[in-house]
Amino acid sequence: MAVTKLVLVRHGESQWNKENRFTGWYDVDLSEKGVSEAKAAGKLLKEEGFSFDFAYTSVLKRAIHTLWNVLDELDQAWLPVEKSWKLNERHYGALQGLNKAETAEKYGDEQVKQWRRGFAVTPPELTKDDERYPGHDPRYAKLSEKELPLTESLALTIDRVIPYWNDTILPRMKSGERVIIAAHGNSLRALVKYLDNMSEDEILELNIPTGVPLVYEFDENFKPLKHYYLGNADEIAAKAAAVANQGKAK
């Protein structure tokens, strides 16, 4: 049976991950640790014999630079790449820039957990005159006002990620090309929920660690057979737990 593999990588630690701030569509770069995580992901993929024909990423530099570092380690810096806002992190609305632990102290751990992980829960909206509104950013100049979020739930993130998967990424895989996606915690959670047919309760508890390759294997009908992280299982579990704990009061 022919098996097709897909590799997903959440960007390495960003400067705002390090500072425990809600990031969303704010274009913050990788921290030094994040660069190291991205390089380590590339080395792991090389050791496991992976190479690719095409890459996808968002229009945010923490994902783009993660992909650069991964491909550099694979000696595939030349690889064609498509960047799409549809793979951006979920938009965190008026929470963007706020410290997660301080927000939890103000509103409670459970409220922040729902804002971070709830399926249909949207954080407080931005206003269009807010400098954080994506309509002020030239990279989104071709998007309609309807497409520009003031805030997003995971459900709304799914509404942009999954059509992009079905219309753009999956057809390329079906043509026989080997694909890697470097994206974000919530855009990848959106895809994982869809691929694994997870319930809303199950997705609430899913935390994707930074800079760890997640491999999906598909059968000839492109139904997922299994998935697994590359790397040390204990270290990966600890990183996922750290992601979960970011939204708790100190």
From Swiss-Prot:
- Single Gene Ontology BP term? glycolytic process
Question: What's its EC?
Answer: 5.4.2.11
* Site description Transition state stabilizer, residues in chain: 184
Q: Which residues form the active site?
A: 11 (tele-phosphohistidine intermediate), 89 (proton donor/acceptor)
CDD domains cross-referenced by the UniProt entry: HP_PGM_like (cd07067)
Q: Which GO terms describe its molecular function?
A: phosphoglycerate mutase activity
Keywords of this protein's UniProt record, alphabetized? Gluconeogenesis, Glycolysis, Isomerase
The pathway that the record names for this protein is: Carbohydrate degradation; glycolysis; pyruvate from D-glyceraldehyde 3-phosphate: step 3/5
The record's Pfam families line, in alphabetical order, gives:
His_Phos_1
Spell out the InterPro entries in the cross-references: His_Pase_superF_clade-1, His_PPase_superfam, PG/BPGM_mutase_AS, Phosphogly_mut1
> Which residues does substrate bind?
10-17, 23-24, 62, 89-92, 100, 116-117, 185-186
Q: How does it assemble?
A: Homodimer.
Q: Provide the function of this protein.
A: Catalyzes the interconversion of 2-phosphoglycerate and 3-phosphoglycerate.
Per the record, the similarity remark reads: Belongs to the phosphoglycerate mutase family. BPG-dependent PGAM subfamily.
Official protein name in the record: 2,3-bisphosphoglycerate-dependent phosphoglycerate mutase
Say which species the protein is native to.
Answer: Salmonella typhimurium (strain LT2 / SGSC1412 / ATCC 700720)
